[in-house]
């Protein structure tokens, strides 16, 4: 047995402490290790793979866990972006961590909190919790009552959730230690209340909500310690708050994208700690002089614009400016000249003077005056001369001169002057001539947009070799010709190529080297030959070669490419359709206006949202398609399809547009079509911005220092390169053929069975399509009555029943249709009075021609009460008194003609004076003809 003296004991203890410190920290306690293992069930295994059940495993060394180095207690849990499925969190799971200071559940998939034992007091068990990040989850107001118990909180982040209603002051009143509060990106509304109890707040972010009203003394102005305030993207109104003059510690103020109005007051000059001031996208008016902010010596970022077009910025100033700006943003300010004071702002790194009335020469003046400039945005002005300094080599990264009035050749030295450019947008101008070969010196260029100009010729070989970092290239709407890329080509980083509406004739195989290509748009060129088989080597999301001269069959290599959109329309492709394509979820397949033949494969609808096979040479019957609840658009018009309309179409319940026109379909219309939605029940709602095909956001790291080190604002200048599929549906409605895209297709629901061989009555069940906007059953052999149930088509705009054999009256209740523009029943056998109320007043006579028994003021034909054929029938009567029995009519007509001819023949068979007289008459007539 060892016996230690007191000095020896303290020495041993000291050695133990030192050894532990040398190890970094002691092991975590067992209670917390078990607590972490309970949490593991809610964390994606990918992020908790080292959370081991082994009792020898030190949880302080586990990923996403932070422990105190001295006590070994867990003080930080960083579970952000680790969820597997949306969950309701039991807060008692965190109770073992009594020393917890930071709990990061950002993007954790949390839908709410609960604690069956401690209830709303649950967070009070975490007495040292200082930072709680619940950003970008799915929680609503149900979590708010839990917050008052967390009185130790200094940072509370709730942005990007589903909070709604007014500012939750009641639930936050006990959080008197809060220094940062982020409620951005929710659904909060109403005025901002008094916040005196949150007097320690340094940073407050209320952006991207719908807060409204004016800002008075009882609200934000009580927060004297406030350093950062973000009110952007709300609905605040009224003038700039005078009481903001008391917020003397304010360093960041963002009031952009609201409805603030009036003139900008002098109190802004009192905010002498400001580094970042954004007043853009409001309704300020009057004259603004930079003298107003001349004394803000710390100001680095200034942004101002107005929605009202009544804001005018004075170009000249009288005071000496004390600030040295890094960022100036004056878009939408009605500027006719560059403000003179900018010449002294040599530290500028970002200039945005877009959407003004600037003219003259650009961008040489800016490049010569601002050696530190990294971003120059001058889009939508009236510059006419594109000039660059001859000997200067500039470090500019971003240049946007789109939508101006340049109409000359691009400078030959553009690549020499701008070798560091990464983003260049010269679109929507009138640039002419060939592409300068000096583009090849832009080794860092990532994005190049030359679309909508008059550029011509072929792409230079040096360009295709030198721009090795190019990822997005837009050449559409020019006059480029020849091969798309000459050999050799080293655009290995190319992901997006948009070159539609040019005169290219050939796709060369050098494109094989661009392995990351996901978006290829080559429509409306003069491409010839077949689709290259090596297209199958790409991981395509978007491929469009429509409106070219391509022919042959679809190469089998394309069948397994993961498309989101494939458009081969308006070419000369032939052969049978493949049995399937490997579409991602909700793909778009356009094969219309080709020469495809054979049957329609039943498997084509797998993972497809739209199938367009219009105007081919397809034959056979419509197959029983594989069921697909996401399938919305089926377009088979203009083929040679035969047989009945299959009842299996009724299983495609989400259909919005069904076009089977101009085929040879026969039989009757299936009544079960009322199972199809046509917008009646939108169980599945499509986003009009569906299908982001390529999405990239790039930040310019060198601009980071241009923004204040803000807790609530982005630190970088970012460019969003998201691209969207042009989702288009062509459909005949209101006597014309229209293309629906963007927001418009969201409201298009239609059915077209016209120009077939359909018979039988129109099913009354078609009246269940309450949201349908266009219904065309014309040019068939449909019989019976116009269904009275059509009065239930409350959103209908166009009904075409022309060229059928319908009879009976036009139901009077159709006058209830408030949006009807076309009601064409011409060339039928309808009878009775034409309705003349509501929208029917504006319908002209062409809608009714070919119906001899119709009458009314619309066709200027009176109705005779004594003629049963002209009587208006009670739409609710079961007896059709005016209806003509067409079968009896045709049999009577046939019998009359038959009996007449038989009598005439019998008459000629008997010898009589009448017979002799008849033959003499015939002889006289023949002699007369000979004389003539």
UniProtKB/Swiss-Prot annotation:
Any one Gene Ontology cellular component term annotated for this protein: plasma membrane
Gene coding for it: RLP9A
A Pfam match: LRRNT_2
Organism whose genome encodes this protein: Arabidopsis thaliana
Name under which the protein is recorded: Receptor-like protein 9a
Keywords (A to Z) from UniProt: Cell membrane, Glycoprotein, Leucine-rich repeat, Membrane, Receptor, Repeat, Signal, Transmembrane, Transmembrane helix
Subcellular compartments: Cell membrane
Disulfide bond positions: none
Highest taxon above the source species: Eukaryota
């Amino acid at each position: 047995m060892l016996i230690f003296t007191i000095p020896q004991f303290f020495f041993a203890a000291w050695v133990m402490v030192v050894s532990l410190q040398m190890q970094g920290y002691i092991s975590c306690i067992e209670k917390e290790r078990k607590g972490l293992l309970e949490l593991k069930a809610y964390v994606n295994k990918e992020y908790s793979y080292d959370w081991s059940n082994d009792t020898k495993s030190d949880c302080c060394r586990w990923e996403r866990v932070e422990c105190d180095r001295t006590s070994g207690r867990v003080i930080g849990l960083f579970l952000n972006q680790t969820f597997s499925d949306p969950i309701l969190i039991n807060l008692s799971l965190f109770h073992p961590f009594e020393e917890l200071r930071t709990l990061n559940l950002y993007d954790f998939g949390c839908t709410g909190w609960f604690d069956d034992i401690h209830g709303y007091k649950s967070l009070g068990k975490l007495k040292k919790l200082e930072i709680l990040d619940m950003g970008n989850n799915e929680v609503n107001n149900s979590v708010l009552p839990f917050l008052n118990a967390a009185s130790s909180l200094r940072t509370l982040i709730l942005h990007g959730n589903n909070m709604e209603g007014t500012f939750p002051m009641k639930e936050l009143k006990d959080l008197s230690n809060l220094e940062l509060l982020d409620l951005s990106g929710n659904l909060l509304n109403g005025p901002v209340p008094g916040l005196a109890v949150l007097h320690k707040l340094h940073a407050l972010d209320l952006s991207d909500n719908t807060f409204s009203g004016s800002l008075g003394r009882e609200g934000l102005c009580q927060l004297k310690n406030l350093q950062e305030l973000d009110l952007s993207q709300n609905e605040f109104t009224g003038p700039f708050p005078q009481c903001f003059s008391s917020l003397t510690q304010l360093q960041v103020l963002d009031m952009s994208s609201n409805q603030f109005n009036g003139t900008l007051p002098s109190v802004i000059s009192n905010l002498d700690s400001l580094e970042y001031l954004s007043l853009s996208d409001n309704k300020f008016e009057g004259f603004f002089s930079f003298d107003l902010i001349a004394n803000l010596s710390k100001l680095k970022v200034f942004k101002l614009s107005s929605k009202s077009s009544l804001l005018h910025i004075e170009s000249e100033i009288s005071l000496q400016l004390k600030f040295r700006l890094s960022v100036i943003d004056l878009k939408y300010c009605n500027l006719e000249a560059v403000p003179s004071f900018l010449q002294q702002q040599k530290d500028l790194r970002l200039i945005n003077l877009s959407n003004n009335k600037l003219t003259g020469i650009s961008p040489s003046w800016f490049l010569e005056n601002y050696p530190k400039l990294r971003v120059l945005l001058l889009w939508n002005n009236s510059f006419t001369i594109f000039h660059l300094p001859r000997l200067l080599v500039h470090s500019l990264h971003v240049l946007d001169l789109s939508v101006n009035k340049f109409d000359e050749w691009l400078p030959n030295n553009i690549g020499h002057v701008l070798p560091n450019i990464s983003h260049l947008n010269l679109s929507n101008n009138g640039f002419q001539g060939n592409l300068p070969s000096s583009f090849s010196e832009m080794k860092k260029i990532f994005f190049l947009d030359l679309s909508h100009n008059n550029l011509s010729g072929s792409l230079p070989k040096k360009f295709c070799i030198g721009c090795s970092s190019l990822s997005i290239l837009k050449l559409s709407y020019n006059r480029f010709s020849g091969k798309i890329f000459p050999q050799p080509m080293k655009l290995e980083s190319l992901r997006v190529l948009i070159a539609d509406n040019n005169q290219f004739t050939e796709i060369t195989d050098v494109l094989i080297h661009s392995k990351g290509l996901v978006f290829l748009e080559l429509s409306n060129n003069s491409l010839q030959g077949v689709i290259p088989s090596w297209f199958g080597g790409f991981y395509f999301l978007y491929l469009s070669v429509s409106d070219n001269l391509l022919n042959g069959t679809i190469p089998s290599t394309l069948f397994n490419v993961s498309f989101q959109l494939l458009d081969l329309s308006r070419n000369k492709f032939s052969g049978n359709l493949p049995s399937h394509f490997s579409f991602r979820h909700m793909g778009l397949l356009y094969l219309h206006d080709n020469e495809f033949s054979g049957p329609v494969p039943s498997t084509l609808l797998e993972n497809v949202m739209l199938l367009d096979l219009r105007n081919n040479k397809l034959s056979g019957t419509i197959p029983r398609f594989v069921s697909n609840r996401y399938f919305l658009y089926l377009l088979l018009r203009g083929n040679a399809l035969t047989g009945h309309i299959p009842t299996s179409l009724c299983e495609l319940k989400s259909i919005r547009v069904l076009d089977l026109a101009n085929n040879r379909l026969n039989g009757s219309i299936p009544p079960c079509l009322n199972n199809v939605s046509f917008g009646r029940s939108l169980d599945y709602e499509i986003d009009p911005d569906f299908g982001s095909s390529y999405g990239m956001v790039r930040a310019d790291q060198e601009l980071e220092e241009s923004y204040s080190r803000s807790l609530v604002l982005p630190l970088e200048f970012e460019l969003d390169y998201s691209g969207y599929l042009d989702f288009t549906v062509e459909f005949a409605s209101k006597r014309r053929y229209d293309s629906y895209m963007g927001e418009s297709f969201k409201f298009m629901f239609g059915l077209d069975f016209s120009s077939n061989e359909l018979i039988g009555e129109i099913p009354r069940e078609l009246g269940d399509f309450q949201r349908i906007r266009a219904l065309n059953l014309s040019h068939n052999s449909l019989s019976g009555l116009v269904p009275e149930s059509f009065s239930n088509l409350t959103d209908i705009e166009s009904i075409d029943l022309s060229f059928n054999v319908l009879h009976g009256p036009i139901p009077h209740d159709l006058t209830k249709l408030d949006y009807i523009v076309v009601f064409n029943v011409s060339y039928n056998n309808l009878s009775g009075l034409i309705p003349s109320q509501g929208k029917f007043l504006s319908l002209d006579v062409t809608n009714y021609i070919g119906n001899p028994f119709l009458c009314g003021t619309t066709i200027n034909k009176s109705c005779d009460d004594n003629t049963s054929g002209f009587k208006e029938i009670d739409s609710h009567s079961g007896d059709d008194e005016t209806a003509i029995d067409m079968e009896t009519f045709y049999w009577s007509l046939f019998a009359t003609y038959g009996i007449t001819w038989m009598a005439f023949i019998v008459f000629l068979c008997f010898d009589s004076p009448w017979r002799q007289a008849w033959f003499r008459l015939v002889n006289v007539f023949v002699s007369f003809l000979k004389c003539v």
